Regions:
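Active-site mouth of glycoside hydrolases
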Residues: 46-281, 286, 291-292
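Low-complexity, intrinsically disordered or signal/transmembrane-proximal segments
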Residues: 9-12, 34
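Bacterial N-terminal signal peptides
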Residues: 26-37
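Acidic, Ala/Val/Gly-enriched low-complexity intrinsically disordered segments
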Residues: 16-19, 27
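Catalytic-core region of carbohydrate-active enzymes that cleave or remodel glycosidic bonds
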Residues: 238-240, 264-265, 269, 273-275, ...
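Boundary at the C-terminal end of the N-terminal hydrophobic targeting segment
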Residues: 40-42
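Aromatic- and carboxylate-lined catalytic core of secreted/periplasmic carbohydrate-active enzymes
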Residues: 67, 305-310, 316-319, 333-464, ...
Length: 486
């Protein structure tokens, strides 16, 4: 058990409060409060450390100083206005968010917005300030370089690039021309040079991402282009991770392309996008969010990529990605978000799921606290040291997502009869579960493990529980709880 977790346990222990003399209680409270305060501020070597793939267990991240790092965050796309920066970073700090993803070529962040290879220093200052605030608030940033899907003379879709087209003074007739020609590839490398000169060797950067969902571009040259450009990223940003992404994994026939990308040597992270989408060709995308998120992670685990897996985009959409789902307006408690955060990590991913639609899913309903609840559940957990084995057990009343480690068993118990359909479509409130017995015997390392702690993320409350004959009985809860055995 970590010092900080133990301190919190003592502070909330009725035994300590009631049995100690008042003077001793006050001294202990002051000392523990000082410890907690010291822990709230990072050491300088942590701030200056880079995110790396752990050498102890390549399925997880750590910092270059050896500290474990679990990316807890979301997609900050479209990018916020500069006047929103201070408010958003305060929210992130208050809710223990340590990661976000941005598109650096989107809207007012796009430095190459008037002419090819002409970079706007004023717009670069917006990115500068964002990264400065990220550093101050201990947030690592994934920098996604491109997202456009076609080069056209006139705008047909939001994702079209106009300035690259010959009709508008650019050098290219088409997307094919840009991706396949020597001129087009040299153009992209020159853009990398500009970013490297300004932002190279920056520990705030979690990773550089070549392109958002590159297999969705108008032509299908993403693989050859990616194979050439990933090493270019590594040469310019040798201390940062380099990654690429594909479109939503919503159809079984995408399995081979996902496997191909996940196994590319120069692609440091096995990323997957997966949404609740009732128009998807894969039926699993129509069902409970914990199930569809977990299955996406397990699909990538089956590829045996030997690198961290992250559900880097997830959310709820109208059928066939025709917009943000109406479900968010009904989700006052954050059921969708909760499952998107917890299910991937407890299925073997290296971090939470990273939600899309941040304004609708997070900001407007003010559901940011769910990140803090996840952070509380995993506080003090060291995934690279534990070498977790993910296990999922499905029973009639619950699904148990277990991470079995060398010294720790961490499990997320999800009510299998509760999901977005039961609450938002059928109108059934979550049932209160009482005296639910869970068999943990197959996950425990010995008879000495007779105590557990249970965290209710809906109430933000820990409770001590006994394990008897390998079984734990859970008291009153709804939807889900986390079980910790150390």
């Amino acid at each position: 058990m970590t010092i900080i977790r133990k301190c919190k346990q003592i502070l909330h222990s009725n035994t300590v409060v009631t049995e100690m003399p008042m003077c001793k209680r006050m001294v202990i409270v002051v000392l523990i409060s000082q410890l907690l305060t010291l822990n709230a501020y990072p050491k300088q070597d942590e701030i200056s450390s880079f995110v790396v793939v752990s050498q102890r267990d390549s399925r997880y991240f750590e910092l270059s100083n050896g500290s474990p790092y679990i990316p807890i965050g979301f997609n900050l796309v479209g990018p916020p206005r500069e006047e929103e920066f201070d408010r958003l970073f305060k929210i992130m700090a208050d809710n223990r968010i340590n990661y976000c993803r941005v598109w650096v070529s989107h809207n007012d962040w796009n430095v190459e917005h008037e002419k090819c290879l002409q970079f706007d220093p004023d717009r670069a200052k917006t990115i500068d300030r964002f990264l400065s605030l990220a550093r101050k608030n201990r947030v690592r940033v994934k920098m996604c370089l491109e997202y456009f899907r076609d080069i056209r003379s006139d705008r047909n879709r939001w994702s079209d690039n106009l300035i690259y087209h010959k009709a508008n003074g650019g050098p290219y007739e088409s997307m094919h021309d840009y991706l396949s020609s020597d001129e087009g590839r040299s153009h992209f490398k020159a853009k990398l040079d500009w970013y490297a000169n300004r932002y190279g060797d920056n520990p705030v950067v979690f990773a550089w991402e070549l392109w958002n969902e590159m297999d969705a571009v108008r032509v299908s040259e993403w693989l050859d282009w990616t194979k050439e450009m990933l090493p270019e990223l590594h040469s310019r940003f040798p201390r940062n991770l380099a990654v690429q992404s594909l479109g939503s994994y919503d159809w079984e026939n995408k399995r081979q392309r996902y496997k191909t990308l996940c196994l590319l040597k120069d692609n440091n992270v096995a990323q997957v996008h997966r949404y609740l989408d009732e128009g998807a060709g894969w039926e699993i995308c129509h069902g409970p969010v914990d199930v569809l998120a977990s299955q996406a992670v397990r699909e990538l685990i089956a590829f045996n990529p030997g690198k961290p897996i992250i559900l880097t985009e997830t959310g709820a959409v109208k059928p066939r990605h025709m917009g943000c789902s109406e479900l968010y307006a009904k989700d006052q408690d954050g059921i969708l978000l909760h499952d998107m955060l917890f299910a991937p990590f407890f299925s073997g991913a290296a971090g939470t799921g990273h939600v899309w639609w941040w304004r609708q899913a997070l900001d407007e309903p003010n559901l940011w606290y769910h990140f803090a609840r996840f952070a509380e559940a995993v506080e003090g957990i060291n995934p690279p040291a534990e070498h977790f084995e993910p296990i999922m057990i499905s029973e009639n009343r619950y699904r148990l997502y277990v991470l079995k480690g060398r010294k720790t068993v961490l499990a997320w118990c999800r009510d299998s009869q509760n999901d977005w359909k039961s609450e938002f479509v059928l109108g059934h409130p979550p049932e209160i579960l009482d005296s639910l017995e869970i068999d943990l015997s197959s996950f425990l390392s010995g008879s000495h493990q007779t105590q557990a702690r249970v965290f209710d993320p809906w109430k933000n409350r820990w409770q001590d529980k006994s394990i008897k004959s390998g079984r734990i009985t859970l008291d009153v809860f709804k939807r889900s709880v986390v079980i910790l055995v150390e």
